[in-house]
Amino acid sequence: MKARGFKAKMRGFKIFSGSAHPAFGKEVSKHLGFPLSKAVIGKFSDGEINIQISESVRGKDIFIIQPTCVPVNDNLMELLVMVDALRRSSANSITAVLPYFGYARQDRKAAPRVPITAKMVANLMQEVGIERIITMDLHAGQIQGFFDVPVDNLYGSIVFRDYIRSKALKNPVIASPDVGGVTRARYFANQMGLDLIIVDKRREKANESEVMNIIGSAKERDVILVDDMIDTAGTICKAALALKEQGATSVMALGTHAVLSGNAIKRIKESALDEVVVTNSIPLVQKCDKITTLSVAPLFAEVIRRIYHNESVQSLFT
């Protein structure tokens, strides 16, 4: 996928990249054929973020690329400070391009006396002056409703779909690594025209280890686990082992966001997984032979172009 070149009227457009994922910003810029605008991003001696926009943005439509990944709080605050600087510099509109939306897992009250942090972050973004959000594979789709501004939640499945087809697997089947991810896995299975199986983990009694039940058959099949993010990798590694024990020929995991915290890389290396496929929505710090990274920068570039030209985004995914 390649964004078509900008027309002369794109003179009213500027694109900035924060420090969270500069390589992604450069790649999007390259696909757009439009240079990144400049800003000086620094910190005071006490850690406070300090930003100065290095060129005029008066009357311009601004797109800021900044996934709110690790360090989540610093990257989120940097985004907010940059938006404030742009708004006070008379930008016409400000769109936040968040390949990964941090705090998305705190989308409801799952226990007494806990916050709904995803809603609080949405409030902060709107209050500071963000007028549109472009993100991908939100952990909970209902987060779109936390905003009173347009939210374009892109589907990472578009790049996974092409990759899976290129593998020419003989007897593939889609799997959800847990019951909570069934809707996401079913969507991908429908896109691919494949069957769906589910890994259901249960603890039959207190203080007993989890039992992995497979709903459907994985025997002699190439299983493709589908999830929105891979954090500690515990769930997909346990699911892969259960699937191999049932007779799966191979097990591949697809995860849009490679959070990979803690011992995730070590778990993946030692697991029954044959391959883990992720996108570059988050910079991959550690390398692993089992991990394949697909770029979604061309997708984001084309979406930015379409939004600026008031063209349909949904048609990309149909």
UniProtKB/Swiss-Prot annotation:
Mg(2+) 1 binds at H139. It catalyses: D-ribose 5-phosphate + ATP = 5-phospho-alpha-D-ribose 1-diphosphate + AMP + H(+). The active site is at K201. It is found in: Cytoplasm. Mg(2+) 2 binds at D178. Its main location: cytoplasm. GO terms for cellular component: cytoplasm; ribose phosphate diphosphokinase complex. Pathway: Metabolic intermediate biosynthesis; 5-phospho-alpha-D-ribose 1-diphosphate biosynthesis; 5-phospho-alpha-D-ribose 1-diphosphate from D-ribose 5-phosphate (route I): step 1/1. Its cofactor is Mg(2+). One of its GO terms (molecular function) is magnesium ion binding. Binds 2 Mg(2+) ions per subunit. Involved in the biosynthesis of the central metabolite phospho-alpha-D-ribosyl-1-pyrophosphate (PRPP) via the transfer of pyrophosphoryl group from ATP to 1-hydroxyl of ribose-5-phosphate (Rib-5-P). Homohexamer. This is Ribose-phosphate pyrophosphokinase.
